[in-house]
Design a protein with these regions (language model features):
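A short, structured active-site edge motif that brings together acidic residues
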Residues: 10-23, 135-139
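Beta/alpha (TIM)-barrel catalytic core signal, keyed to glycine-rich beta->alpha loops juxtaposed to Asp/Glu
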Residues: 61-187
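Non-cysteine beta-strand/loop elements that form the S-adenosyl-L-methionine
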Residues: 13-17, 55-58, 162-166
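Active-site mouth loops of central-metabolism enzymes
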Residues: 22-38, 77-86
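N-terminal binding-site loop/beta-alpha segment at the start of enzyme catalytic domains
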Residues: 1-18, 31-38, 42, 51, ...
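Short acidic capping loops at alpha-helix termini that bridge into adjacent secondary structure
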Residues: 9-12, 51-55, 105-106, 130-134
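Specific alpha-helical transmembrane segments that line the substrate/conduction pathway
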Residues: 30, 58-59
Length: 187
């Protein structure tokens, strides 16, 4: 294993994610909770041959998300706010225990909204849980939600953006010009 051979684990930053409802191919799309976190974290630690993860991210909120070009269909009007806040409490409580155990160093979010991010911050503050340090959301010239949705939260709450899809899934690369769709492309 590359990591073990180097013998310099502290010189490397490892980030990984636990995926929830956004991906049906992993744990059948079960929501993120203490059981799915425990399962995913244990497997990640074993697979990566390490005893801790520097940044452990929650990939896709359990309540859904408008990210990855789902903004036209996203409708939060049927969300149960009390259930969502309890869900965030349970997740942060469990992740904070994993931080205390030394298995996780930092907590991050992925494909989260400004409201969701603020709930993580508020609940962490109210309960002395570990704080979210980063958010990994889509960001490109074609997808600027971060600028109008999260930049202010990130600045004032000291949460770093780890952007993904800077070429908008290839749309900005030029390979889809003139209506052409290359074979085996993502779109």
């Amino acid at each position: 294993n590359w990591l073990r051979k180097r013998k310099k684990r502290d010189d490397i930053i490892i980030a990984t994610k636990v995926v929830g409802i956004g991906n049906k191919t992993v744990r059948e799309g079960k929501p993120i909770n203490e059981h799915t976190i425990e399962e995913a974290l244990t497997k990640s630690l074993k697979r990566l041959n390490t005893d801790y993860i520097d940044l452990y991210q929650l990939h896709w909120p359990n309540r859904g998300s408008y990210h990855f070009r789902q903004n036209w269909a996203y409708n939060p009007s049927n969300q149960n706010t009390k259930k969502i806040k309890q869900d965030i409490f349970d997740i942060l409580n469990f992740l904070s225990k994993k931080v205390k155990e030394g298995k996780i160093r930092n907590i991050g979010l992925s494909n989260e909204t400004a409201w969701g991010t603020m709930q993580f911050i508020k609940i962490a503050n109210e309960n002395n849980f570990d704080h979210v340090v980063s958010i990994q959301n889509e960001y490109s010239l074609l997808c600027r939600f971060y600028d109008t949705d999260l930049a202010e939260v990130s600045h004032n709450e000291n949460i770093s953006l780890l952007s993904y899809s800077p070429l908008a899934a290839g749309l900005l690369s030029g390979k889809y010009q003139d209506g052409k769709v290359p074979e085996k492309s993502r779109l």
